[in-house]
């Protein structure tokens, strides 16, 4: 399913600060719904479902704001997944609390967005993004289906050998990975993306002469759905990558596709292969792989599907280039 993204730097959107300064450790369980991580947070005491999205900003739908009697206080410019810039209303959530009541993010800033097409099946009121956790350390464990949020007085105890530094300002988990033999690419770790890797066209064109990649098919169809709407139909490529390295962890024989996002995305499927810890204040990304070497060999259909107005449609048709 196509997905929604609210791209932007955390630093540009004022941070929520936990209510207390002492050490804390909160647990947020999650469940997978249609390749999305769905969590519950308490909004002014009311438990509400959200998509957990490390590549996005915290946001409430207009419908949720009406139900919770939350009003707009300001507006700001946002760039969505399709690089479309629009102005959106913003608000402050007086109390945004973890489900175990351990952390209360006071006056948490939130965008106000319209209901996004295709979200009906998720049954959520919005997005919890990286901006909310800017002063914390977040660990995501797919084996326990828990997100652990801790205070950041001390760095993570995970080995520095498993650590990648953030490569850009702004507090988003943007790091460098490698495509064999020598190509470095900058990726955004984005739990809102359903793939292991989604390669932007500019990265594909830049590294194509030096990387060991093969175009296996070409597709034409609908673009990704962003908060400003759906992108125009466009062509894209399916690409076979013999070796992708995330730190010391290797992923072999991966098939991905090109897209037009602002960044190449390292998606939620990474969690199937290891535990992720993000130290936001220090700009550190840790990946503790279950296995150091992983054979992917993902199978791809000749078409992609999407949901539109409650019905299932073919969104992209792929044809062989051989």
Protein language model annotation of sequence segments:
Residues 1-26:
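Bacterial Sec-dependent N-terminal signal peptides
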Residues 21-322:
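Pepsin/retropepsin-fold aspartyl endopeptidases
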């Amino acid at each position: 399913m196509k997905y929604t993204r609210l791209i932007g730097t955390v630093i540009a959107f004022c941070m929520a600060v936990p209510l207390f300064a002492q050490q804390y450790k909160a647990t947020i369980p999650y469940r997978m719904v249609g390749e999305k991580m769905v969590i519950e947070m308490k909004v002014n005491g009311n438990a509400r479902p959200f998509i957990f999205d490390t590549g996005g900003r915290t946001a409430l739908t207009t419908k949720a704001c009406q139900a919770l009697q939350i009003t707009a206080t300001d507006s700001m410019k946002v760039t969505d997944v399709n690089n479309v810039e629009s102005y959106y209303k913003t608000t402050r959530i007086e109390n945004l609390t973890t489900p175990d009541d351990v952390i209360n993010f006071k006056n948490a800033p939130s965008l106000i967005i319209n209901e996004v097409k295709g979200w009906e099946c998720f049954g959520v009121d919005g997005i919890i993004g990286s901006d909310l956790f800017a002063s914390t350390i977040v660990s995501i464990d797919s084996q326990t289906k828990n997100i652990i949020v801790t205070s950041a007085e001390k760095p993570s105890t995970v080995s520095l050998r498993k650590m990648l530094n953030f490569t850009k300002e702004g507090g988003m988990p943007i790091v460098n990975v490698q495509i064999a033999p020598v190509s470095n690419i900058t990726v955004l770790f984005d739990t809102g993306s359903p793939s292991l890797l989604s390669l932007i066209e500019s990265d594909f064109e830049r590294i194509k002469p030096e990387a060991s990649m093969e175009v296996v098919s070409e597709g034409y169809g609908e673009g990704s759905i962003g908060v400003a709407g759906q992108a125009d139909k466009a062509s894209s490529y399916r690409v076979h990558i013999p070796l992708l390295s995330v730190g010391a962890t290797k992923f072999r024989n991966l098939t991905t596709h090109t897209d037009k996002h602002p960044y190449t995305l390292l998606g939620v499927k990474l969690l199937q292969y290891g535990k992720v810890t993000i130290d936001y204040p220090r700009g550190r990304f840790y990946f503790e792989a279950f296995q150091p070497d992983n054979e992917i060999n993902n199978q791809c259909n000749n078409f992609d599907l999407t949901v539109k107005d409650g019905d299932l449609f073919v969104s992209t048709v792929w044809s062989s280039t051989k």
